[in-house]
Amino acid sequence: MQLRKTLLVGLVSVALLSGCSLFNSEEDVVTMSPLPKVENQFSPTKVWSTSVGSGVGDYYSHLRPAWQGTSVFAADRKGLVKAMDADTGKQIWQTDLSEKTNFLSSNHSAMLSGGVTASGSHVYVGSEKAVVYALNAYDGQVAWQTVVAGEALSRPVVSDGVVLIHTSNGMLQALNESDGAIKWTLNLDTPALSLRGESAPAVAFGAAIVGGDNGRVSAVMMEQGQLIWQQRISQVTGATEIDRLNDIDITPVVVDGVVYALAYNGNLTALDLRSGQILWKREIGSVNDFIVDAGRIYLVDQNDRIIALKSDGGVTLWSQSDLLHRNLTAPVMYNGYLVVGDAEGYLHWVNTDDGRFVAQQSVDSSGFLSAPVVASDKLLIQARSGTVYAFTR
């Protein structure tokens, strides 16, 4: 089993108590698959690239660009937020959210980790310091900032006048979109040991659908923060603490009244949106967001297999195993192809019909952590180094 995510501080505490073993002593050490040889059927064109601060480095900060209208917004971990022209990559504005100290010392990192989200007149980003920022989309000035219940590790989600934040300690909070005031807080319960990351909510018909570290999917009324239903899709099993992790750190997908959810050590599950009743499930685990499109589900599992399944019943259509343990990003659909990045900075383009590679390109040696983003006719991706790239096909 490949441990894909940094664990919470609680993991270290558990390991120290009573000499507790986190890993099975017989567990194999995984090795990254060699780069597969691909005969490119086309060559994606790099339109522009631009640096955004120092990126995320070796930290597990899931920052990725956001696109709205003619602008692209991106951030680095230290606190630099930048707006760029979507066609050229030229800077429109930049804002530094790092904490100012005296003139002899460098600024303290803002530790940005959740975002970036662009919606309406604001750009939103959250931090490990439990602060959510709203910046004016047109000039980058801070419109408001709010201290939330815990680390904001997932991207803010904006809908129906509220900004939804899922914090690292299992709190789902709704902030007023205009001024950041907290409207309600709901405790979704977090076990002592969990993966470092949280599911960003999906929104449908006035409800927020969110996965929790307790292996449950919850539906919450956005207006009042009232729980509608809760369904467990991942059970605590296994001999080691790692095997018993059952987080749902992936954003659910809602299509035609069905909620699709995916857990780390659990199942790919389809649930009825109205009742939460389980319609079907498959034993597949992941830490990456997935796609539901045209009757198919596309995902990257915890061992970096790329898998296509039928959305009605979960039957496997194909599986691509040539990128095992290359620490793939979540997939995106772009111009009819699946695209994933990997830890060595390659982009892999995959045929959706059979899972075969159609193109491969080396982009940035610092590697990719966060998924690509589709921005109209362009594909955007941000490397660990902070550089944002725009490609066309």
Curated annotation (Swiss-Prot):
Source organism: Yersinia pestis
Keywords on record: Cell outer membrane, Lipoprotein, Membrane, Palmitate, Signal
Quaternary state and interactors: Part of the Bam complex, which is composed of the outer membrane protein BamA, and four lipoproteins BamB, BamC, BamD and BamE.
Reported function: Part of the outer membrane protein assembly complex, which is involved in assembly and insertion of beta-barrel proteins into the outer membrane.
Predominant location category: membrane
Single Gene Ontology BP annotation: protein insertion into membrane
Bilayer topology: Lipid-anchor
Cell compartments where the protein resides: Cell outer membrane
Lipid addition sites, S-diacylglycerol cysteine: 20
HAMAP family per record: OM_assembly_BamB
Pfam families in alphabetical order: PQQ_2
InterPro entries the record matches: BamB, PQQ_b-propeller_rpt, PQQ_rpt_dom, Quinoprotein_ADH-like_sf, WD40/YVTN_repeat-like_dom_sf
Signal sequence segment: 1-19
Lipid anchor positions (N-palmitoyl cysteine): 20
Gene name of the encoded protein: bamB
GO CC, one annotated term: cell outer membrane
Name of the protein described by the UniProt record: Outer membrane protein assembly factor BamB
Family that this chain belongs to: Belongs to the BamB family.
